[in-house]
Amino acid sequence: MGKKGAGYGLRGGDFRYNDETVARLINAVMLDGKKEVATKVVYDAFDIIASKSEDGDALEVFRKAMSNVAPLVEVRSKRVGGATYQIPMEVQPARRTALAFRWIKQFATRRGGRSMAEKLAAELLDASNEQGASVKKRDEVHRMADANKAFAHFRF
């Protein structure tokens, strides 16, 4: 019998907060392997969040935003007897966070012409207040799953 694998996740987390999810956000924001640039963008965004939020805790705002954006269910396509059905499926925890990172980055980059740090901070603040495009995307995915509840018995 072989040894147990190393498992998922980053060891240790980021430098400032020592948090694994912040390190994963930095990796999600990173383009072309430029990790220092991504780290600066995320830390600047957290500084903006700390100055704009009431309690001044950027990490708490980030965690709340992540929980508000992460989807619980999604639809997956399955072909049954010549017809394709959208089947609602529960989302695994690793995929939940990955989708949340993807949507936050995607909708932050689409915001108006400020710096990426300001756009990311605005999207995270909106998401923590149950607003913003990334929360709308999560609600849209949940609505799709709810509309296709009738096909739940086709589960994989």
Curated annotation (Swiss-Prot):
Gene Ontology biological process terms from the UniProt entry: translation
InterPro entries found in the cross-reference section: Ribosomal_uS7, Ribosomal_uS7_bac/org-type, Ribosomal_uS7_CS, Ribosomal_uS7_dom, Ribosomal_uS7_dom_sf
One Pfam family named in its UniProt record: Ribosomal_S7
Claim: tRNA-binding is one of the keywords in the record: yes
SUPFAM superfamilies: Ribosomal protein S7
Keyword field: Ribonucleoprotein, Ribosomal protein, RNA-binding, rRNA-binding, tRNA-binding
Superkingdom assignment: Bacteria
Annotated family: Belongs to the universal ribosomal protein uS7 family.
Name the UniProt record assigns to this protein: Small ribosomal subunit protein uS7
Taxonomic source organism: Chlorobaculum parvum (strain DSM 263 / NCIMB 8327)
Gene name tied to this protein: rpsG
